[in-house]
Amino acid sequence: MSEQIGSASNGVMAGTPREVVVYGSAEGFTQEIVIGPHRLVADEPADMGGADEGPTPYDLLLAALGACTSMTVALYARRKSWPLQGVTARLRHSRIHAVDCAECETKEGRIDRIELNIEFAGQLSKEQQLKLLEIAKKCPVHRTLTSEVDIRTRAEWKMHAGSA
């Protein structure tokens, strides 16, 4: 059985990438994020120089992982007709010294650590809970974060009216 999730309900075929556009000014940290019909704001907390008008970029990254994990687990349980009533994912991001991570390949410098704690609600057997924990690690965002990622950054320069 395929472990992939997709939905065509938003007019985008499953697996079709949708462009995310982020608008920001050279002043402050507040960013407007546009994803199809959705509008979000990202910012930094006041103690980091931001206006605290929205979640931080790391908050959004954790939200993406948590939402994907919850959706993946719920979909799997529905397909199996298991009595899962709800999923709560709590996530934290930190940076640790590589030497403090015995299971990590990197042994120098610092590494990013994401702690993901999942709570399953429902009358699930121990075997079902263990299987759902295994499935949680197969969500597409989890796989992306733990795989090799090729980010291709390009730039465009636009002169605005009144610019020199």
Predicted regions and their residues:
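Metal-dependent nuclease catalytic cores in nucleic-acid-processing enzymes
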Residues: T72
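Extended beta-strand/beta-hairpin segments
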Residues: M1-A63, L75-A164
